[in-house]
Amino acid sequence: MFWDAELRDELRGTELAAHLSEDDEAFDEDFETCRDALGEETANAMGLTLETFKAAASIAASRAFYVGGEYGECLVPCADLFNHRTGTNSVAVYGVEDDDDSDDSDGGDSGDTLVIKAVAEAKAGEELFNTFGEQSNASLLHKYGFCEFHNEDNVTVNLHVSLFEDVYGREKMHAVYDAMKVSLQSAEEERKQSLLDFFEAGKYYEITGANGVEDEFFALVEKIKDALVEVENKKVETNDVFEAIIDARLARYGAEAEDTIDEGGRPPAGGGVVGRQAAKLVRLQEMRLLNRVRQ
């Protein structure tokens, strides 16, 4: 995503915002690698700049198909005409890896052919859709530049240990971690390590629109609550810990998001929203999800 600072600010607090600076660094490195491989004279003659490199990379990343076999990912004319819509699939694309499983006898399925077949009835003039798989709006915006209003089930928010540090402070959470290690000494090794990986290995838990909060996160909160009771030497309620963590996650979005996103105007091909509206939608849907699980 090659947005300026003003547009990126619309994503503050979202799961996507954290990835953008990483993307910038990766693109800079890839650009230098390509430029060094071509040599300065050739790169200049081709007009290769960081901006033209980003433009080309964005086309390849958003429109390439994984064909399989020795070909890997390819840009395929016509196959990239189909937009994505969650829950709708008008066509299916079969690559070389699917040929062995194909039982069609109507010809055309050779080892170097990409086949597109209709899988749903369509009327003349209707837009046909492919599917890019079940993805959150944050993922769709990151990879393809658009979001969908109806894509609520795939909204995802991650819960990291840093949220506990926001609430209780790093020093206290170190003490909580030490207390948890002692309390888990007699626990089954796999379960013990699964809980401690939250502190030791960058493990995180997900909240999704379809499934809510992962069950194991509640088990973790219960263990952290017990450790807090020991560290603070006072009564602590599990629900208070959970609500404090959700509030800390909500605080990262800053000011309240707009309650609604304008759906007016001409939508892009495939429907949905792009640009500032898309960023606001990602932020609003994540905040709605957090408020829902907090209730």
What are these regions (language model features)?
Residues 1-295:
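Long, positively charged leader/targeting segments at protein N-termini
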